Amino acid sequence: LRVENLDTNLKEPQLFWYRLITLIWAPIQFLTLFGILTLTMYTEMALAEKIGLFCAMGVLTGTIGINYAHELMHKSGKIERWLADALLAMVLYSHFRSEHLLVHHIHVGTPRDPVTAKYNENFYKFFIRVLIQCPISSFKSESIKLGRKGLPPSDFSNPFYIYFILQMFMLALSFLV
C-alpha cells in the first residue's frame, strides 16, 4: 500500500469525485439492470446472449454494487444510507446492512460471525451457511436492538420492513417490464 501520500485530514468537500462516483452508482445500476431486462424481453436474442447478459449483470451488481453499498452504509448521511439500501434491494440482499453493521463488525473472526469462514471450511459449505445464517443473525440483532428500546421486533422502526418493501418493489418492477 502506498500510504506515504495519505492525508487523513481531508474534509468531505475535498472528496467530491470519490463521493460523486459512489452516489451516482445506484441510479446507473438501476438503469443498467432494468435496461438489460427490457432489452432481453423486447429484442430477439439467442438464449446464450441472454444468459451472458444476466451473468455479466450479476457480476456487475455483485462486485461493484455490493461494494458501493458497503461503502455507503458506513456513511452517516441519510442519502448515502438510502442509496446503500437501494443497491442491496436490487440484488435482494437487503439484510446485509444489518448483518454487516450489527453482527460482522462486532463478532468478526469469531464463531458468532456467519461471514467468517471456519478453518478448512470449503467454499460451498461456507456459501450455503452464509445464505442461511446471515438473514437470521441480522434479524436477531435488529430484534435485540429494538428490545433495548423496549420495542418488539414487529415495531415499524425495524428496518426489515424497509428491506422487504424495497425488495418487493424491485421484484414488482422486474415483472412489469
Short names for language-model regions:
Residues L1, F16-M41, A48-G62, D155-V177:
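Alpha-helical bilayer-embedded segments of polytopic membrane proteins, i.e.
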Residues R2-K11:
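Membrane-helix interface/capping segments
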Residues C55-I165:
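Membrane-embedded catalytic scaffold of the fatty acid hydroxylase/desaturase
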